[in-house]
Regions:
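Conserved SAM/SAH-binding beta-strand->alpha-helix loop
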Residues: 94
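S-adenosyl-L-methionine
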Residues: 106-152
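Acceptor-substrate binding/catalytic loop of class I
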Residues: 202-224, 245
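Conserved SAM-binding loop of SAM-dependent methyltransferases across substrates and taxa
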Residues: 73-86
């Protein structure tokens, strides 16, 4: 007789995993245009939450070695962490996203969308931080891109880490999601700060007609997994609705914690 646990395991194994998708064919520019071409208030909320978390990191000054995991075609994580960063690394797997990020970091100007998000960042930090009107020079001097899988993150390397909408958007398997969260939590030195956001009840997403995976998760399930691998967890649920606002998005949970 098959036990419930065996049934659950078999069901999980039939779901698509990270390796089943053509990440090399990910259309980075199409993704950017769809998700960031028209800034949404919830994106601004991510920045405000992240800025508050970063401001609370112990120690003054721009002295942290920080990684963003699964960056994708997105500069928002850089903006959030720049004021406290000595060095910022985008840890990204897809070749297309790596090339897109490298080109974006070399630009001498900001796209209007990025300028909007930087303006939100400056406001979130406040005038006492004296942030410049454009982050272009800060980005060029502090940011770099490393190609790598979330599952291959080195342990205990960074002072702080961010991960926005990555672990749940690379697989349909719960075991792989938890492995990604665990790798994220362990990449920071003990006592370091972890800042993350996860999609809630996402139904999946397409980029240029090609479908990519999302794990359909409740806020409670996300919080439980995150708490298994971090300490001092704080959670805020943002914009969660029944119907998707845009494909693959119906709200998120924002989490902070401390690496063990």
């Amino acid at each position: 007789m098959t036990t419930p646990a065996q049934t659950a395991t078999a069901a999980a194994q039939t779901r698509s995993g990270n390796a089943d998708y053509a990440w090399a064919k990910f259309d980075s520019e199409a993704y950017f245009q769809h998700y960031y071409g028209d800034p949404h208030p919830d994106d601004d909320r991510v920045i405000k939450c992240a800025a508050e978390a970063v401001k609370r990191i112990p120690g003054a000054g721009q002295d942290l070695d920080i990684v963003d995991v699964g960056t994708g075609p997105n500069l928002i994580p850089f903006f959030c962490m720049l004021p406290r960063a000595r060095r910022l690394t985008a840890w990204e797997y897809a070749h297309s996203n790596v090339a897109w990020l490298e080109a974006e970091l070399l630009r001498d100007d900001l796209r209007p969308q990025w300028q909007h998000f930087w303006d939100v960042t400056r406001t979130a930090y406040g005038p006492q931080w004296s942030l410049p009107e454009t982050p272009v020079e800060l980005i060029k001097s502090k940011c770099n891109v490393t190609r790598g899988s979330v599952f291959d993150l080195p342990q205990g390397r960074w002072d702080a880490a961010t991960m926005f909408f990555c672990a749940e958007s690379i697989t349909e398997r719960l075991d792989e999601f938890e492995a990604a969260v665990q790798a994220f939590a362990k990449c920071v030195k003990p006592g370091g700060t972890l800042v993350a956001a996860f999609l809630v009840r996402s139904g999946g997403y397409e980029v240029s007609g090609r479908r990519f995976p999302v794990l359909h998760l409740t806020a409670e399930a996300i919080e439980a997994v995150f708490a298994r691998h971090t300490s001092g967890v704080e959670s805020e649920r943002i914009g969660i609705v029944e119907a998707e606002i845009r494909s693959g998005y119906s709200g998120f949970v924002f989490l902070t914690g401390t690496a063990r």
